[in-house]
Structure formats: C-alpha cells, structure tokens
C-alpha cells in the first residue's frame, strides 16, 4: 500500500471532527491527496448501521450486538473506502477505527478484549493505522453543555460519566501498549494548540511521503 492511514480516536466531544478538518486542509495545501472518512459509516451500508447504533430508539442493544455491528460496518468500510484509497497513494484521515471498539465495547462495556480483537482482525483485513492520535479529554459536564446548546445526545452520548471514564482509561491503556504508533494529545486546550500537536505528530509519520509527493 502506497498511502498513509491516520486515525483520530477519543471520547465523544474531544474535537476529533475539527482536528481532522484542520489537518486535512493543511495536507491539501501541501499538495497531498486526502480522503476524509468515519466510523461507523463511510459507506452506504455503514451509514445505515450507524443509524441503528446511535439512535436512542435502540437502547436495548446488548454489548455483543453493538460490537458486531461496528465490526460489520468496519469490514464494509475497509473494503470499499480505506483499502482502495491507500492503494491509490492517498492519505486517509479516519474518525475512529478498531481502537474505538476496544475502548467502548471492551473497556466501556466489559466485552472481552481478546475476543473483540479476534472479531475485528478480519474486519480490518490487515489494515493497521500508521498513526493513531488519541485526543485525551475529560467528558465531565459535556452532557449538560450539549443540553444548553440545544443538540440532543445520541445513544452512546447518553451514557453515564463512569462509562466515559472507563473508555478514556481504555484509550490510554491502548496507547501505552504501542507508544511508537500512538500519540496522546491533551484535547482540553485551545483548538489551535491541539492542532499544532496533531500536525507535528502527522509530519513525523508523513515526512517521507510528503517529500515523495512534492517531487511527483
């Protein structure tokens, strides 16, 4: 694969969408071909699965059903979007990937981590991110802020603070397992400061790729 795969992870409200946009715009200004995508979603099938996963009407979803739906959306996403883009030499910026399943369904819901890894291995089809940016953020008070803004919380966002504390701890544990591939970034700071750290981490991974692209 000629492209690069950068994944943004973190609890809901950590600013992933904003930081993906900022990094993508910077890379595009440098002549880099960028693909923006997300999980669950990114494909027609994946977006329908996303509707089920995030709709509060389906609050009865049990943890394993939730985990398998995420894996199904991921398998479609990898085959239809991620792998083709990487083969074409593009930089794929993805909002969530396999670590979300481990953090949310594993650490958050208590689903066995090893079994989750076994399920997601074929779903990911051997694709491993070149860089995982974990935007570390304390979600305390986020539900109240959302209510004041007038936006209703989705099924996952309605979880209790203790759930999000477990998810956050899970992300930090995952990052500690492979520090060379992960960067934990304090997302509680100003947007511009977070972007500078994101850009620095991305440039370390993309250095040779960017040089090659500039010569093309």
UniProtKB/Swiss-Prot annotation:
Q: Which UniProt keywords apply?
A: ATP-binding, Kinase, Nucleotide biosynthesis, Nucleotide-binding, Transferase
Top-level EC class: transferase
Q: What is the lineage of its organism?
A: Bacteria, Bacillati, Bacillota, Clostridia, Eubacteriales
Similarity field? Belongs to the thymidylate kinase family.
Q: List the disulfide bonds.
A: none
- Would you name any one GO CC term? cytosol
Gene Ontology biological-process annotations: dTDP biosynthetic process; dTTP biosynthetic process; dUDP biosynthetic process
Q: What does this protein do?
A: Phosphorylation of dTMP to form dTDP in both de novo and salvage pathways of dTTP synthesis.
**Residues reported in the UniProt entry to bind ATP:** 10-17
Q: Which reaction does it catalyse?
A: dTMP + ATP = dTDP + ADP
Could you tell me what this protein is called? Thymidylate kinase
Cite the Pfam families for this sequence: Thymidylate_kin
Molecular function via GO: ATP binding; dTMP kinase activity
EC annotation? 2.7.4.9
């Amino acid at each position: 694969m000629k492209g690069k795969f950068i994944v943004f992870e973190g609890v809901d409200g950590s600013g992933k969408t904003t930081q993906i946009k900022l990094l993508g715009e910077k890379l595009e200004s440098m002549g880099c071909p960028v693909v923006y995508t997300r999980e669950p979603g990114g494909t027609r099938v994946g977006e329908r699965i996303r509707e089920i996963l995030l709709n509060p009407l389906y609050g009865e979803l049990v943890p394993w059903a939730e985990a398998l739906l995420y894996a199904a959306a991921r398998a479609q996403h990898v085959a239809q979007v991620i792998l083709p883009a990487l083969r074409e030499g593009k930089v794929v910026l993805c909002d969530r990937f396999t670590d979300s399943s481990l953090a949310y369904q594993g650490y958050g819901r208590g689903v066995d981590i090893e079994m989750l890894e076994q399920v997601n291995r074929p779903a990911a089809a051997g694709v491993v991110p070149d860089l995982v940016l974990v935007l570390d953020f304390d979600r305390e008070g986020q539900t109240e802020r959302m209510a004041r803004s007038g936006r209703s919380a989705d099924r996952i966002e309605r979880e209790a603070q203790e759930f999000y504390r477990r998810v956050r701890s899970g992300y930090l544990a995952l990052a500690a397992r492979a520090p060379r591939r992960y960067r934990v970034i304090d997302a509680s700071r100003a947007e511009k400061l977070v972007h500078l750290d994101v850009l620095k981490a991305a440039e370390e991974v993309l250095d040779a790729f960017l040089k090659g692209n500039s010569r093309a």
